[in-house]
Amino acid sequence: MFSNAFTDKAVMAELVAKMLWEIKAVHFRADEPYRLASGMASPVYIDCRKLVSYPRIRSAVMDFAAATILREAGFEQFDVVAGGETAGIPFAAMLAERLGLPMIYVRKAPKGHGRNAQIEGYMPEGARVLVIEDLTTAGGSMFKFIDAIRAAGGVVEHGIALFYYDIFPEARGNMKSKGVDLHYIATWRNVLAVARELALFDEKTLNEVEAFLNAPLDWSGRNGGVRALAVQ
């Protein structure tokens, strides 16, 4: 169970950023940009799935996730924790254990045989469900799972991402307009701040990353990626 130690939010963000650098989950590559699934060109890439392979780090991150939810959403607001296929599943299991709640997971699509289920596990009608993902850019992938839960009779008013890109100012407002408050621990700003503090890259690379964070679609367009993107 969660220890109820409520670390300061800024401290949690900085520590998670440092942990992500420590396990080499973060990559900066301004001279040869990554191409994201959205079509955007990006000088940054993160693999939060690596967290599951580092027990001490994953334990700390999940403690921070529990603290974030209890502080920002409340102690008795949820009946079930849900993770999306596949990256969200292990984090849902760990967060559910800390919060003392049941867990379900949501497939990207019904499995197509047997019960043709999209939701695995037991979710009572009207259950208040907390959805967790390892990371989110604008909430689009999270809403695929939220829509499935709502269609099955669950109530979703909160989602949490361990890492939030925080590059589109309208993203959280869009989620709020659909009835969901987004919570998160760390962002690219935290990761960049640690990179500067520890001098992990040359100044040119750091400045390019900051330029991307300030105007991601402009940066993408200048570097061969899409110049427009519907933030849903």
UniProtKB/Swiss-Prot annotation:
It is an enzyme of class 2 (transferase). The keyword Transcription regulation does not apply. Its EC number is 2.4.2.10. Keywords: Glycosyltransferase, Magnesium, Pyrimidine biosynthesis, Transferase. The keyword Magnesium applies. Pfam families: Pribosyltran. SUPFAM superfamilies: PRTase-like. Pathway: Pyrimidine metabolism; UMP biosynthesis via de novo pathway; UMP from orotate: step 1/2. GO terms for molecular function: magnesium ion binding; orotate phosphoribosyltransferase activity. It catalyses: orotidine 5'-phosphate + diphosphate = orotate + 5-phospho-alpha-D-ribose 1-diphosphate. Its cofactor is Mg(2+). PANTHER family: OROTATE PHOSPHORIBOSYLTRANSFERASE, URIDINE 5'-MONOPHOSPHATE SYNTHASE. Belongs to the purine/pyrimidine phosphoribosyltransferase family. PyrE subfamily. Homodimer. Catalyzes the transfer of a ribosyl phosphate group from 5-phosphoribose 1-diphosphate to orotate, leading to the formation of orotidine monophosphate (OMP). This is Orotate phosphoribosyltransferase. It comes from Rhizobium meliloti (strain 1021). The lineage of its organism: Bacteria, Pseudomonadati, Pseudomonadota, Alphaproteobacteria, Hyphomicrobiales.
